[in-house]
Amino acid sequence: MAAISRAIKQELLEDLKPEMYLPPKSTRRRAKVKTEEKVDVKTLVKSKSKKRRAAKNELEENVEFVRRFAPRRPYQWRGRQVRALPRPGIPVVFTPGQRSGVASKRSYDEVYADEDVLDQSGNMINEFAYGKRVKMLTHKNPTPSQVPITPQEPIARPGEAGLLPTVQVLAPRDSKHETMLPVTKSEGGDVKVENKGFEQITPQLGVQTVDIKVPVKRKSEVEDEILKRAKMEPFETTVKMEYSEQPQVEVFDTGVEPSSFFEVRSQARPIAVARKRRVPTVEVMEVQQSDHTAPTASAAPVANVIVGPHLSRRPSRWGPANAIYPDYVYHPSISAKKTMGPRPTGRVSRWGPANSIFPEVRLHPSMVSAVTRAAPRKSTKSRRRRRVRTRRAFVLPAGTKTGVMLPQNIRYHPSILFRRA
């Protein structure tokens, strides 16, 4: 009875108020636009534009979703180190919403490689020649308690691209570095050599271990005898440093290199000598002179020239650095004598001893008259100067093309000269 009454009520309800899902009609009335004549102001909204807007809104409301978008997951880029390391043959693609695995297998369509890529990897060529980890065949260590005592370095085979096999000596880790005494075969006994065999580490590397046992323990009596013999032997030096006679000290001027004993040079090249405080002593300097001839065994003995006693040169205030003069080579046109500047007296320089080192200069003849000459230095050492007289070259008398003779001490352009051969 209840079901019949429910059906009657539903039928009556559908007739009275049908179940239609339509947008409700707007109860708002349109605003009437009141137009006034003779008004310059435009209306705010035109009727045509209102119709167009209404049609546009209807299209936007009835939007049909053709496909379903994949859900985007947020990615935390902050603090991440992005390293793009694509191997050859991997297409760089982005699939939204799909997480890439750590070592995901590639489908065959994504692989672009040679047909013999497996053979290349086995032979370690082309792509697999450099920068690839080789396959370790074993991790066995036959000598776990040994430490290397010699370096193992690659040795190139001359003339070939291969390498020679290397040897590395290992020793027990607990062995102490004892004093090495002379060991013979009779004292040491028999040496045991044991070959551990050949072990293949990688396809191109093998290790062969050879165990060598050398017994070095001896009887205490023999060891004591060797130590006693070593202690009783007198200590002898290999090189004997003896003087046939007492060494003779030769003292020269500070900062000047001693010249040769067989030829007295006119100018000795100065060198820098470390400053030492010397005690005034009587010095003897032997000088041998020869007229540019090599000394022979049958030559007559040269008498020694003994210099009288004199006090050694008092070290200057600034040390031997003031004796260093540069070794100059001048132009042949500079033939004037050396012009000596005034020596500094008292306080040498405001800026230190470096400014007091002045070289002895030679000026051009045209500049000699303009420079006042100072008094020459008082030197106790006599200087020998070798004057080289050069013969002036013969110059033909020069004249112009018209026949006028020109003075010889004036240089003219070659285009105006006329010389007779």
From Swiss-Prot:
Classification via HAMAP family: ADV_CORE5 (MF_04053)
* Subcellular location(s) per record: Virion; Host nucleus, Host nucleolus
Record's family? Belongs to the adenoviridae core-capsid bridging protein family.
Q: Name the gene that codes for it.
A: L2
Function, please?
Associates loosely with the viral DNA to form an outer shell around the nucleoprotein-DNA complex and links it with the capsid by binding the endosome lysis protein. Dissociates from the viral genome during entry. Might be involved in nuclear capsid assembly of the viral particles through its association with NPM1/nucleophosmin.
Query: Species lineage, top-down?
Result: Viruses, Varidnaviria, Bamfordvirae, Preplasmiviricota, Tectiliviricetes
Q: Does the keyword DNA-binding apply?
A: yes
Q: How does it assemble?
A: Monomer. Homodimer. Exists in equilibrium between monomers and dimers in solution. Interacts with the histone-like nucleoprotein; this interactions bridge the virus core to the capsid. Interacts with core protein X; this interactions bridge the virus core to the capsid. Interacts with the endosome lysis protein VI; this interactions bridge the virus core to the capsid. Interacts with the peripentonal hexons. Interacts with host NPM1; this interaction might play a role in virus assembly.
Q: Which GO terms describe its biological process?
A: viral release from host cell
Q: Which organism is it from?
A: Canine adenovirus serotype 1 (strain CLL) (CAdV-1)
State what protein this is by name: Core-capsid bridging protein
